[in-house]
Amino acid sequence: MKIYADADALPTPIKDILCRAAMRRGIALVLVANKALRFPESPHITAVRVGQGFDVVDGVIVERVAPGDLVITADIPLAAQVVEKDAHALNPRGERYTRDNILGKLAMRGLLSELRDSGVVTGGPPPLSNRDREAFANQLDQFLRQYTGN
């Protein structure tokens, strides 16, 4: 099992939680981004730097992810592709994307996009809070215990 992170917009506290978990549990973490990243030196952590372009990071993750892997992303279309490949997806606020909820998430994303395009200001998500960080850490820990046994 590997953990892939859509690291371009990944909040630093979430990246730090992932790095600590990978080192502590000996699980491969692959940070995929189109920019240089800072991360602790560890045999369990690698970075894949991709070229600029729309959804290039997503394409690399989808190409590499295997059933049972975990992908960390706030990108709902990417999460849908991951779930379709029988892998798992978790967003930086600790919410799991599953076969049961992904279609609803895609529909809501589409609706909000239409509202923005029509001039209705919908705003973005609020800044990552301490509660969000805690929820992410708890969900990650629960997932790793369930799927890796450690």
From Swiss-Prot:
It comes from the Bacteria. Pfam families: DUF188 (PF02639). InterPro entries: UPF0178 (IPR003791). Belongs to the UPF0178 family. This is UPF0178 protein DMR_20710. It comes from Solidesulfovibrio magneticus (strain ATCC 700980 / DSM 13731 / RS-1).
